[in-house]
């Protein structure tokens, strides 16, 4: 869905200030094959990212310190709740956990009945909205980040620019799903297309949850479903 040229335009895009609020989005992983990846956003502009492989206790401490360093309030931090992300819940009580399988979120009362026919789940909804943001060139990234090199399961010292170009392949429709709305390709299948776990791109698109939540995010229906 996202073409190579689409991402190159994002890489060269002018700074997208948005609301200017500092937020962070993360894909949780402890010591093992996958990377823990966390992005710093200012509005719709990516200002920084951190990639780590640490044990659970050390990672929690490191994330708390990084959020303070970045000036991100806990209520503006989202992370994937699935699996080991459950461990984070007790340490970040005010954060917005991203539950992949939660129901899609309606922005108005009128949308509540129809939204479930547009998207299979919350992750599919956010992935599609992120796709639109890229197509409309409404996000940007600090150019210096693109040359930073990272390693992971199946790749070694690869520039971020190349990693994101490879991982964009994870954002595609699951052709095996029924016709009921957009369903994102499952992660197992995405790994086959990408060649490794798409931790950078997944954590990138989680930021879209903030376009669906209000300040009192605990009241958003489906967001806290386990």
Where are the language model's segments positioned?
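RNase H-like, metal-dependent nuclease domains and their acidic two-metal-ion catalytic environment used
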Residues: 1-120, 124-128, 132-226
